A protein has these predicted regions:
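Cysteine-centered iron-sulfur cluster-binding motifs in ferredoxin-type domains/subunits
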Residues: 211
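Short acidic active-site motifs
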Residues: 63-65
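FMN-binding flavodoxin-like domain, especially the glycine-rich phosphate-binding loop
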Residues: 25-29, 35-40, 44-60, 69-208
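Low-complexity, intrinsically disordered or signal/transmembrane-proximal segments
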Residues: 2, 17-20, 25
Length: 211
């Protein structure tokens, strides 16, 4: 599995004060990317929504875990699918961050997947609900399979990669428009046998990766 190559530094807006030993940042789109697909998605959303980006590993490393919300802000999470679920680092980040002045602001997620998402929507919505936050929208974007996840899987052919990238552009245009209108909609491709993939295979995958 190829993960975690160095990405470009993200733009972070910082307020002029501290609380409880942590910087408090203005809200933006939080993202994690392992091979670059989700970074590209995050950049397209950042341009479309005029929101800054926060690279999740960098925020965790710097203990930048408190974020100031404005009344009409939009809050986004962008990440790849790892074995039909959000990456553990994304769930850990959600568990640790604090959103100051949260008042049911519009919250969405966009995930990149090679083929399908399994029950990713359920997993992420529950993680947000556990923090007292309501998820209003969620989307999946099919991107090239450019890493080997499990035995029996392979990267996409160059032709399939080209087709996926071509289709991703109008898909992001559509998603940006829906988010701009603050639509309450979920459009994730679960695929076949989502329970098996997310609830059984994913825990085994995570255990294998940590062993």
């Amino acid at each position: 599995l190829q993960r975690g190559r160095a990405l470009k530094s993200c733009s972070i807006r910082v307020s002029s004060h501290r609380r409880y030993g942590f910087f408090i940042y203005s809200p933006m789109i939080f993202y994690f990317s392992g091979t670059g697909n989700s970074e590209w998605i995050a950049n397209q959303l950042s341009k479309g929504q005029n929101e800054d980006l926060v690279f999740i590993p960098e925020a965790l490393k710097n203990e930048a875990l408190e974020f100031d919300l404005q009344k009409d802000e939009k809050i986004g999470f962008v990440f790849p699918i790892y074995s039909w679920a959000p990456p553990e680092i994304v769930l850990r980040f959600i568990n640790r961050i604090s959103l100051k002045e949260y008042q049911n602001q519009y919250l969405f997620f966009v995930c990149s997947c090679g083929d399908d998402t399994g029950l990713t929507q359920q997993v992420l919505v529950k993680a947000l609900n556990d923090k007292g936050w309501l998820c209003h929208a969620g989307f999946s974007v099919t991107m090239p399979n450019n890493y080997v996840l499990l035995p029996g899987f392979d990267v996409d052919t160059k032709e399939l990669e080209r087709i996926k990238l071509a289709n991703a552009v109008p898909r992001l245009t559509e998603i940006n428009a829906l988010i701009s209108r603050r639509e309450k909609i979920f459009s994730c491709h679960e695929g076949s046998l989502p329970f098996l993939k997310t609830r059984i295979i994913n825990p085994l995958f995570n255990r294998f990766q940590m062993s």
